[in-house]
Amino acid sequence: MTTRRRAAFGALQTKAGGRMNMDNEVSAGLAPFCMRVADLVVRIRPLHAMVGRLCKDYVVDASLAVDIEIGATQADIDYERDMATEGTDWTDAYLETLAVQRAIANRLPEQHRLLSHGAVIEFEGRAYLFTAPSGAGKSTHIRLWRQYLGDAVRVINGDKPFVRIPECREELPVVYGTPWAGKEGWQRNDSAPLAGIVLLSRSEPGASSIRPASAALNIDKLMRQVYFPPDAEASMLTLDLLDAMLARVPVYDLACDMSEDAVRASFEGLTGLDYHDYVRSASHED
């Protein structure tokens, strides 16, 4: 781990704090269910029906071998309420869905996986992760890709994808859809190899551009878009996984407005294809 990354990690850990207690209370009243997410079978002991409805696209046979077992307590729900910066009238049922997400995320590093904050699209079998602080325009940019490129673009997840980093250094990380998909609800139970990570920012109108970026020089930004568990060992493992991911996946800076030219810039920079040639070819095929 580089000195820069250790320093950024130390600052992040200082702010992290928190406590979670996900595994010591059995839910009453509702039957446990199993879901498959990021190629892991997770057994959930729900307190409220909402979490089951949220995960319905991922539910699998309960007889499968379980990789992770979790269940949120009322204390965990109260913790999520304390962590909320808005929406203090959220119900316990909704907050349980956040607590379950956090519980799974806390266990991902031991399975060579991590949770990222970003929107993921898949184009021709390769995934691209757009990440930025909330409100920077990720969803708008994804919506423009879908508007101008149609069914050739699939959204894997709009907010909280999981990423698996294979132990083999020759293999690309794989990004997965999850039920936690932001206010748009863009998600699918699918996966694709991760071919690019995009640091998105807004540009002046007509000034959209994309360029390769240094992962080392942008490590602070990248770390802020990855979930680090409160457990020190799991956090260190997450940092190792992030290092491994960045060693295999190129990073880009994208400055974009809300126009078709923003799609052209990011499309050409990420895929290496000529945007207008591709659009003409696709229209002829239709």
Predicted segments with their positions:
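Charged, amphipathic alpha-helical linker segments immediately N-terminal to NTP-binding catalytic cores
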Residues: 60-104, 270
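Glycine-rich, often acidic-flanked micro-motifs
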Residues: 23-32, 38-56, 63, 89-90, ...
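N-terminal amphipathic/basic-hydrophobic helices that include classical n-h-c signal peptides
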Residues: 1-20
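N-terminal active-site beta-alpha-beta segment that forms phosphate/nucleotide-binding
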Residues: 105-106, 112-114
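Post-Walker A alpha-helix
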Residues: 141-142
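Conserved glycine(s) of the Walker
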Residues: 137
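Intrinsically disordered, low-complexity regions
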Residues: 11, 18-19, 72, 88, ...
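The conserved Walker
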Residues: 134
